[in-house]
């Protein structure tokens, strides 16, 4: 990323690298209650966090987590390629299932997620985490329905 490309947008551009050593990172989000940023390191099957002092492991294994976001209550919502599900982690660390199937068929490999201001959760479900055994981003599996899909979950 060239600093010159952004000069017209910001006068005090200050980009700092906070971590190296991951293979493929996705889904950074800020956990306000804990004043930290978490993200997924998919092939290493872990989630990392940065508390503005140091980077540490947040969750390992992470079920090859990918996209993350925060719901309207400050809980972490995570797409897990490996478990083929979407979960929420409350502020006490308790993980609860949001979705793992559609029409009684397993999800493919939930990927990205966002939450509407009314609490509705939207997530994508491509097959990437199950169809390519040479790429470590989940566990090989059978697609239960075709295509790349977007789902809506009303709480």
Predicted regions and their residues:
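Sequence-structural signature of mature extracellular/luminal beta-sheet repeat domains
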Residues: 1-155
